[in-house]
Amino acid sequence: MLRDSVGGVETRHLDLNADLGEEVTDDEALLAVVTSANVACGYHAGSVAIMRAVCEEAARVGVSVGAQVSYADRENFGRVELEVSAEVLEEQVADQVGTLSQIAVSCGTEVRYVKPHGALYHRVVHDEVQAAAVLAGSGSLPVLGLPGGLLLSLAAGIGRQVLHEGFPDRAYLEDGRLVPRSEPGAVLTDAETIAMRAVELALQESPELHSLCVHGDTPGAVAHAHAVRRSLEAAGFGLRGL
């Protein structure tokens, strides 16, 4: 959360992001609500044509673009951990970021941050080798991820901008990690509950969050995003992209 003060009145700012370009949701409808788009780079979902379509619309409506990098695993939608060497993973991340960057620039925008997807997102919370590979492959981009994990710790240690992310549509474990999707209740589906949870996360002081994510592949994602945005704005938050 960022704070601005104008005329003595403090405004709290937060980002609302969603995973896009995965061919499982209405990208255009979500881009009308969110402020940042985590764009699939072809390794778990998406294609050059889809990346271009998302980037064009994001540029048109003023939504920030981020590279959603993944294991090379379209069969499992990037949700299975893979044993990949650091060298290979670094090359794969660099390929994804580079491809999306070229497309984004051609559409009049740019890649503003990197965020791992699925199994890789959770792996780099505790795996130093893979976390370092993601950082090495993503240049100097700001890094969006789960607070308290190795990825963000390593990123901060080398001077990268670190962005803390929260998930109002997911259940949490006591240690701050997300409940695995395989467990009952891991994914929340009631829009009102998700919206209330979003405000709770936005107001928490430790860790302070920079962005909230609404999963684009969850049924009702567009309605969830609208509910979250309405609740955040009603709570006094201004929304802006990363």
Which residues fall in each region the model found?
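C-terminal alpha-helical cap/extension of soluble enzyme domains
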Residues: P180-L242
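Active-site rim beta-loop-alpha module in soluble metabolic enzymes
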Residues: L150-L203
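Active-site-adjacent beta->alpha loops and helix N-cap segments on the catalytic face
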Residues: D27, G46-A59, V124-A131, G148-A155, ...
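N-terminal glycine-/serine-/threonine-rich phosphate-binding loop
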Residues: L2-V63, Q102-S106
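Hydrophobic faces of well-ordered beta-strands that scaffold small-molecule active sites
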Residues: L14-A18, A37-V39, V65-V69, R112-P116, ...
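Glycine/small-residue-rich loop that forms an oxyanion/phosphate-binding "nest" at active or ligand-binding sites
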Residues: R74-P116
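Glycine-enriched alpha-helix->loop->beta-strand junction motifs that scaffold or abut catalytic
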Residues: V33-A37, A59, G137-L141, G157-L163
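Catalytic beta/alpha-barrel core
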Residues: V39-H44, L89, R123-V124, S140-G149
